[in-house]
Amino acid sequence: LEDSLDLVDMLVDSGIDFLHISCWDCFTPPTHHDDPRMVTEIFAERLANRLPLITCGAVWSTAQAQEVMDQGADLVAVARSAIGHADWASHLGDSGYEPQRPPFTAEHLLDEGLSEKFVDYMRAWQGFVV
């Protein structure tokens, strides 16, 4: 983690426009690190508002998106939730939005606009496609 934080300073000094981090799970503290804070909080502190921070990782609900913003993210990115729900962002105005989580049927994913090839790829993700 320390090497990544040092890299942040180098990237900021190089003139990047924003930093995007993938936490895999925004709600679990980093392993092998004594700091109990979430990864987003640690990176936000290091950035000190020098540029926007985009974070993703296991964000499914409106409440979780807000929690990540409260951790210091300027923007929240999503992957798995948007794969399963192409209209995910359109529900963020609903504070109680809590979409279905995996496993998804292949039919559901095809209905969401995924190609058969991508659905086959997602089968390799344990527990994502049934």
Regions found by a protein language model. Give the residues of each.
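Flavin-dependent oxidoreductase catalytic cores
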Residues: 1-130
